[in-house]
Amino acid sequence: MIRVLLADDQTLVRAAFAMLVGSDPDMEVVGEAATGLEAVALARTARADLVVMDIRMPELDGIEATRRIAADEDLAGVKVLVLTTYDTDDHIVDALRAGASGFLVKDTRPADLLAAIRTVAAGESLLSPGPTARLIARVLSAPQPPAGGGPAGPGMLSDRERQVLALVARGLNNTAIAETLGLSPLTAKTHVSRIMGKLDARDRAQLVIIAYESGLVVPAGAAADGN
């Protein structure tokens, strides 16, 4: 059973999410928070496995609430899925930097939200396709650092690892990566683990941040275009 805490300042939104989550036999709503401070407090007392967190809330916004949850050693197992009307790049980056394991916009289909909760609760990371595509577009247009020029330089990754990183950054799971590259799921998982180790990333979501900030992902036509 996945224990879910809902954090949103709008009562009707919380009620709708509670009804949806409660309809799934594998999920249970263990608390509702109307402010960021309430979300942090309830995360400590309700023994939630996952927090569905809105960004815009009074007293403490969802990003800072996420940061406090992620920094609390007693809440080390609690995952945060940010669900909001905001889908700007800065909000996505801030949420992932704060420790969120996923980011979805509120126009997500109900079935996709439930699937996202399962994915994040299982330890995977998840991003809405639209925002992810925009992030990657910015990554690909960013100046590339010199190979091996820093602790997270492209020279640290093999060609295959760069391919895998590009697919991770686009939101593909290990099975989809394996199918795309003609690998076994176990081999894809091994590549992802090695990349996370080399780049000192805590999870797949942070790999997107690393790609976004360092330009590790190179577009297929970059060499021809001179980018």
Regions found by a protein language model. Give the residues of each.
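Recognition helix of helix-turn-helix DNA-binding domains
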Residues: 171-206
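Short, flexible helix-to-coil linker/hinge segments that flank and couple to helix-turn-helix
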Residues: 92-97, 102, 107-159, 163, ...
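Acidic catalytic/metal-coordinating carboxylates
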Residues: 35-38, 60-67
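Receiver (REC) domain active-site loop signature in two-component systems and cognate sites
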Residues: 57
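Active-site residues of response regulator receiver
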Residues: 8, 54, 84
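Active-site beta3 strand of CheY-like receiver
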Residues: 46-52
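Short hydrophobic/Thr-rich beta-strand motif most characteristic of the beta2 strand and flanking loop
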Residues: 26-34, 42, 201
